[in-house]
Amino acid sequence: ARPRVGGAVSAALLLAYAGLKVGDQISLFSFAAKPIGMTPAYMHTQDFPALQRAASRIDYAPVESNFTLALSTLGAELNRRSLIILFTEFTDATSADLMIRAAGRLVKKHRLLFVVIKDEELEDEERRRPESGSDVTRANVAAAMLRDRQLVIARLQRLGADVIEVPADAMGAHVVEAYLGIKRQGSL
């Protein structure tokens, strides 16, 4: 999970720079079991080093993310309609359900884009040709987990959230493209 956090932070910084270049207000918010930090809203590219410093403090935490607390805290901090971009993975059905409920409250006022990091190991496991009984079991478990993941994505989309699934090694380009697409729609 640690390399994925680093990839998400790098993608968030690329996105922040793109947002500053087009004149948007940009803030970083991070959380794990509780909110960790939120930067002020920055508007100019010369403010980018402040965002980099804040991002350098974001690290992997071996705890369950508390989406309910984090998203309600974030919602309370934002006083105008905003585009909220969440980099996430789905680890289990319970945390995914809590995330969906918290997102449901936010999506009423804000535009949400979920950047879901693909689990390529899980996809490989599902596609691997089984050579033993345990291989069949692993493939079936992987297939079930991938189905659950698609159900979570569908629920988020039904709420009105945008969702993109991206490979861990190409998050930046995909998220900037999605952000610019939302900007072109003019729906903020």
Predicted regions and their residues:
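Exposed, interaction-prone extracellular/peripheral surfaces
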Residues: 1-188
